[in-house]
A protein has these predicted regions:
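Soluble extracytoplasmic regions of secretory-pathway and membrane proteins
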Residues: 4-230
């Protein structure tokens, strides 16, 4: 089936119980390396078996793949029908793709934010959250994902500011080990109900060990992805 070569897949499938049996949910992505003026993704933190370990500057988690663990039946559910790349695939592969409304409730109620996508987004957010041109180019207010306090590696962030040339400070990779994203069931500060979400903390990119912000991702009741920064 050629569609397997047209989508990229997350490295972390997860099981759900459907009609008394077990099915695995796999997050599938459409990608491109030809999005005009788009910054290429930093993929250095991804697991080696992630489908996103490649050059791209466009990515959308447009499909949820559900695989029956008993008989191997595979269903492709579209959760982002506005994705232009997926729209083209649907014209080619006909009835292979199903609407998200056809997804069993046992599956849709357990969808989670895709881990590999979150790793890429948080790896780049520390610089691109800035909306002031001067701050963006100086890098003085940039953030980085916090390092793992249990790591034996030196350093405190996945990026740091290189001031070798004072006139041209640069954000460069650090060799420390960043905190892995982690899923949790918790209540966000502005809400009354608990949510199942994925999160990651940020510190200043200059190496200070001060919690500056944390980023969370979750899937809402309509299967759409939602990101928040606190």
């Amino acid at each position: 089936m050629c569609i397997r070569d047209s989508l990229e897949y997350d490295s972390n499938p997860y099981p759900v119980v459907v009609d008394g049996g077990i099915s695995y949910v796999i997050d599938a992505y459409t990608t491109s390396d030809r999005f005009p003026y788009g910054q290429f993704a930093d993929t250095q933190q991804l697991p080696n078996d992630s489908g996103l370990v490649r050059n791209f500057n466009y990515v959308r988690n447009s499909v949820k793949v559900v695989v029956d663990a008993y008989d191997g039946d595979v269903d492709f559910y579209v959760v982002d029908p506005e994705d232009p790349i997926l729209t083209s695939y649907r014209q080619v592969f006909g009835d292979l793709f199903q609407s998200a409304s056809e997804m069993p409730e046992e599956v849709s109620s357990h969808l989670r934010y895709p881990e590999d996508l979150f790793i890429v987004q948080t790896g780049m957010w520390g610089r691109y959250y800035l909306d002031n041109v001067s701050d963006f180019f100086s890098g003085d207010l940039a953030w980085a994902v916090a390092d793992n306090s249990d790591s034996q590696s030196a350093g405190t962030a996945i990026t740091r500011i290189d001031r070798t040339d004072p006139a041209n400070p640069r954000i460069v990779p650090d060799r420390s080990r960043p905190v892995d994203p982690y899923y949790q069931l918790t209540r966000l500060p502005d809400e009354d109900e608990v949510s199942f979400l994925i999160s990651r903390p940020f510190v200043p990119a200059d190496g200070l060990r001060e919690l500056t912000s944390y980023f969370v991702g979750r899937t809402d009741e309509t299967s759409q992805l939602e990101l928040r920064e606190y």
